[in-house]
Amino acid sequence: MIRLGLSASVTALNRDAVRTSIDEAAKAGATAAQMQEVVSLVSGLGVHSLMATAVPIALAAQVESAQFTPEQQMLWEKYVGNDPFWSDFETELPHFLGAMLRLSSEQFIAFFEYCSVPWKSGQVRARLKELIAMACDATPAHRFAPGFRLHLRNALKLGAGRLAVMKALELAAETPPHEGWR
């Protein structure tokens, strides 16, 4: 399943590796719903563009430290609140969520709605999803350190051992570069 996530991620999109990974996952007993959940999870890599740009854009627009409007405050409470996950997230990506909300309430809502999809059905265990996300953030073509640290911590909290982490990183290192999808 980790190999499927890596090969299907936007940083690789390797057609042969995707096919092989699907075949291997199916032979190992993975269901179509589980495979789809993994692909849904890794499709979220695109939000890293938001993470890398929201604060600089908000600073340039001079809205980074503006007070939330009442609507924005309501959205903040609904989606972020006091959830420990988002507190840890803010440690890795300081001010991102607030900057994104100040720039676009619609994007803020869409971020939370889209990123939550693979966490709703529970087809794949959370620990495995964290290992997959961590591996995707560690591929040679991506190297997204804030996400790597966050997902590593989460995987460890969920009981992932050293061997599982090392295997995920090994698979990440072997991920082929994106050569286009024809």
Model regions: which residues?
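Amphipathic, charged-and-aliphatic alpha-helical interface segments
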Residues: M1-N14, L128-F144
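Phosphate/adenylate-binding glycine loop and adjacent helical scaffold
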Residues: S40
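Acidic, glycine/proline-rich low-complexity segments that act as flexible tails and inter-domain linkers
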Residues: S9-A28, S49-L128, R153-K157, R162, ...
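Arg/Lys-rich, alpha-helical DNA-contact motif
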Residues: T31
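Preference for long, well-ordered alpha-helical segments
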Residues: G147, A164-R182
